[in-house]
Amino acid sequence: MSFLLAGCTAHHTEEHAVSQHSTSSSKKHPSTASKKFTNKIDLHKKYKGFKLATIPTQYRGTWYRANAYEKNATKLVITTHTINGAAAYQQTDPNLKLNRHSEKQNKEYAGNAVVVKSVNNSLKVRGFLDLVDLVYRPGQFKGQPFLFISYSTNPKATNGAIFKDKSAALKYRKFDFSKVN
């Protein structure tokens, strides 16, 4: 599972062209068929010690991030119960200890899902068995709504930003957000 920091993996319907070759007695005739693969979100899946989370309103919507070395922006979509196509869960059992080295837990907590926690005007997001959260904090930058991004290893440090406006994300893609607080 990857999230928007180095770039999010989109978890939505994608079209993939598949090359198929049919062979007759003397010639090969290439043809291309288009197949749709859908990575469906299961909001009803149960995980021991977790319940479906509701993402706070200020984080919802379509956000954009642009890498300083690229001219395109990456999209992050946050809905009521999903982050970039992954169902969002919150931990309900405070005594549950997750161990990324556990084969059993790797099977049990596999899937298109993340753990979220809303703390001190920030949203922490991580995979079930990941060690580090991505921390999103809402703010304004030159009149544009945006989210600061940091790692939970140092949540006060700013490692990047994502904007509601794609053109703002592209405009400020080379800006050093570590100096903004």
Language-model features and meaning:
Residues 4-7:
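C-terminal motif of bacterial Sec signal peptides marking the signal peptidase cleavage site
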Residues 9, 78, 177-179:
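Long, non-globular segments of proteins
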Residues 12-61:
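N-terminal, intrinsically disordered, polar/charged segments of Gram-positive cell-envelope systems
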Residues 18-25, 30-33, 101, 117, ...:
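Intrinsically disordered, low-complexity segments enriched in Ser/Pro/Gly/Ala and basic residues
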Residues 36-48, 148-181:
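Edge beta-strand at a domain terminus
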Residues 47-53, 60-90:
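Short, solvent-exposed loop/hinge segments that bridge or flank secondary-structure elements
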Residues 69-75, 88-161, 181:
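Contiguous, well-ordered beta-strand patches that form the walls/edges
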